[in-house]
């Protein structure tokens, strides 16, 4: 039986692979792929009023090597940052509901 963390790692890798390569390099995500990924995979955290310039800004923050694409390392660092922000946000919340065992 796979554990939740194992499932999470697999989901991170598989999600990247699902969206990467439609614009060219199969190991990178271009801006249109990133936009689709955010809208479909993180709809609760992607404001519906996001404009194209908002996606441009987001892309420029993620694209640390400035090659106009997001590689797997940049993608993982962005998810790690998201996890850190969530941890900070939720650490003061009451422990209900409990985490799945």
Curated annotation (Swiss-Prot):
<keyword id="KW-1015">Disulfide bond</keyword>
<keyword id="KW-0106">Calcium</keyword>
<dbReference type="GO" id="GO:0046914">
    <property type="term" value="F:transition metal ion binding"/>
</dbReference>
<keyword id="KW-0479">Metal-binding</keyword>
<feature type="binding site">
    <location>
        <position position="93"/>
    </location>
    <ligand>
        <name>Zn(2+)</name>
    </ligand>
</feature>
<feature type="domain" description="EF-hand 1">
    <location>
        <begin position="12"/>
        <end position="47"/>
    </location>
</feature>
<dbReference type="InterPro" id="IPR013787">
    <property type="entry name" value="S100_Ca-bd_sub"/>
</dbReference>
<feature type="binding site">
    <location>
        <position position="86"/>
    </location>
    <ligand>
        <name>Zn(2+)</name>
    </ligand>
</feature>
<feature type="binding site">
    <location>
        <position position="87"/>
    </location>
    <ligand>
        <name>Zn(2+)</name>
    </ligand>
</feature>
<comment type="subunit">
    <text>Homodimer and homotetramer for the citrullinated form.</text>
</comment>
<feature type="modified residue" description="Citrulline; by PAD3">
    <location>
        <position position="51"/>
    </location>
</feature>
<dbReference type="Pfam" id="PF01023">
    <property type="entry name" value="S_100"/>
</dbReference>
<dbReference type="InterPro" id="IPR034325">
    <property type="entry name" value="S-100_dom"/>
</dbReference>
<keyword id="KW-0963">Cytoplasm</keyword>
<feature type="domain" description="EF-hand 2">
    <location>
        <begin position="50"/>
        <end position="85"/>
    </location>
</feature>
<feature type="binding site">
    <location>
        <position position="74"/>
    </location>
    <ligand>
        <name>Ca(2+) 2</name>
    </ligand>
</feature>
<comment type="function">
    <text>Binds both calcium and zinc. May be involved in calcium-dependent cuticle cell differentiation, hair shaft and hair cuticular barrier formation.</text>
</comment>
<feature type="binding site">
    <location>
        <position position="65"/>
    </location>
    <ligand>
        <name>Ca(2+) 2</name>
    </ligand>
</feature>
<protein>
    <recommendedName>
        <fullName>Protein S100-A3</fullName>
    </recommendedName>
</protein>
<feature type="binding site">
    <location>
        <position position="67"/>
    </location>
    <ligand>
        <name>Ca(2+) 2</name>
    </ligand>
</feature>
<dbReference type="GO" id="GO:0005794">
    <property type="term" value="C:Golgi apparatus"/>
</dbReference>
<keyword id="KW-0164">Citrullination</keyword>
<feature type="binding site">
    <location>
        <position position="63"/>
    </location>
    <ligand>
        <name>Ca(2+) 2</name>
    </ligand>
</feature>
<dbReference type="InterPro" id="IPR011992">
    <property type="entry name" value="EF-hand-dom_pair"/>
</dbReference>
<feature type="binding site">
    <location>
        <position position="83"/>
    </location>
    <ligand>
        <name>Zn(2+)</name>
    </ligand>
</feature>
<dbReference type="GO" id="GO:0005886">
    <property type="term" value="C:plasma membrane"/>
</dbReference>
<feature type="binding site">
    <location>
        <position position="26"/>
    </location>
    <ligand>
        <name>Ca(2+) 1</name>
    </ligand>
</feature>
<feature type="binding site">
    <location>
        <position position="69"/>
    </location>
    <ligand>
        <name>Ca(2+) 2</name>
    </ligand>
</feature>
<feature type="disulfide bond">
    <location>
        <begin position="30"/>
        <end position="68"/>
    </location>
</feature>
<dbReference type="GO" id="GO:0062023">
    <property type="term" value="C:collagen-containing extracellular matrix"/>
</dbReference>
<dbReference type="GO" id="GO:0005829">
    <property type="term" value="C:cytosol"/>
</dbReference>
<keyword id="KW-0862">Zinc</keyword>
<dbReference type="InterPro" id="IPR001751">
    <property type="entry name" value="S100/CaBP7/8-like_CS"/>
</dbReference>
<keyword id="KW-0677">Repeat</keyword>
């Amino acid at each position: 039986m796979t554990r939740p963390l194992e499932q999470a790692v697999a989901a991170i890798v598989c999600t990247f692979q699902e969206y990467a390569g439609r614009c060219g390099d199969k190991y990178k995500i271009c801006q249109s792929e990133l936009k689709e990924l955010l809208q479909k995979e993180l709809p609760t955290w992607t404001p519906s009023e996001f404009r194209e310039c908002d996606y441009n800004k987001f892309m420029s923050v993620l694209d640390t090597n400035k090659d106009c694409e997001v590689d797997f390392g940049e993608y993982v660092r962005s998810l790690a940052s998201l996890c850190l922000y969530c941890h900070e946000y939720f650490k003061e919340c009451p422990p209900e509901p409990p985490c799945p065992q």
